[in-house]
């Protein structure tokens, strides 16, 4: 018999946190975050991380579990989420996966296998060199030439995933997007319900703009400055997240604060559109 799991997803600022708490309290659920940023310690404001008082006693997993210099990718998410699910089932409760990153959710839901090929260290080093010499956008364009679908799904700043997709294509001759589609076609090992929250676009945009303004008021600049002082740098996966890379540009003197805030609002709206 398949074990139950609930997925609750939707765009930024749509109200997933509040809905997930209400749902968990009604059905006896525990929450697993599928957010690629909230897993990191010290990154509270920019990730819109749930506060302990907001949890209302509902257990949460994959929140504040990694240091910002640690890598967090889909395979690690699968491993950590499965461990959390074991605990939740042992407690007699239902896992509620909230987020977040759709790719991560699909990987968990359909138990997608990402271990088909081994790493090619020589080719990987060559791609890393190209990224440093010619920039992330150049490497992203190389991916677009061989796997346009993956290029649409992977942000140019996520150099590690771009390299992995290029590496997979070189080793197998297959697009990693096609491989993942094949894996997704498998039957899920879980009895799942999948909910997508949505709202009027204008209302959503207004909430996003207000949220960004509130983040700045709450100390986003100070949070990013503190991360810098701890030695965390822009080339780390954690520091490439929305809210962090824009403020880093400001703190590094590459743009004015008004421009950084404008870009953050704009990119967050675009990000929300992709999840709607």
Locate the predicted segments by residue:
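Phosphate/pyrophosphate-binding catalytic cores of soluble transferases and nucleic-acid-acting enzymes
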Residues: 1-274
């Amino acid at each position: 018999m398949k074990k139950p799991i609930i997925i609750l997803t939707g765009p930024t600022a749509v109200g997933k946190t509040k809905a997930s708490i209400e749902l968990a309290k009604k059905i006896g659920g525990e929450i697993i975050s599928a957010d690629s940023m909230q897993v990191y310690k010290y990154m509270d404001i920019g990730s819109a991380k749930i506060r302990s008082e907001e949890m209302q006693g509902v257990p949460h997993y994959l929140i504040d579990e990694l240091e910002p210099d640690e890598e967090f990718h889909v395979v690690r998410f699968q491993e950590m989420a499965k461990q959390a699910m074991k605990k939740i089932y042992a407690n007699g409760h239902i896992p509620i996966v909230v987020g977040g990153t759709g790719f991560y959710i699909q990987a968990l839901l359909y138990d997608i296998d990402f271990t088909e090929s081994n790493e090619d260290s020589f080719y990987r080093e060559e791609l890393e060199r190209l990224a440093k010499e010619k920039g992330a956008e150049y490497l992203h364009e190389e991916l677009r030439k061989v796997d346009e679908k993956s290029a649409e799904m992977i942000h140019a700043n996520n150099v590690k995933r771009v390299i992995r997709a290029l590496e997979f294509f070189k080793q197998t001759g297959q697009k990693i997007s096609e491989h993942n589609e094949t894996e997704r076609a498998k039957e899920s090992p879980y009895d799942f319900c999948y909910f997508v929250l949505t709202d009027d676009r204008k209302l959503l945009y207004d909430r996003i703009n207000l949220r960004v303004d509130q983040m700045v008021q709450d100390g986003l600049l100070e949070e990013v400055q503190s991360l810098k002082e701890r030695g965390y740098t822009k080339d780390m996966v954690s520091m490439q997240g929305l809210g962090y890379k824009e403020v880093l540009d400001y703190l590094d003197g590459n743009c004015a604060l008004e421009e950084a805030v404008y870009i953050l609002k704009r990119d967050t709206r675009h990000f929300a559109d992709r999840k709607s």
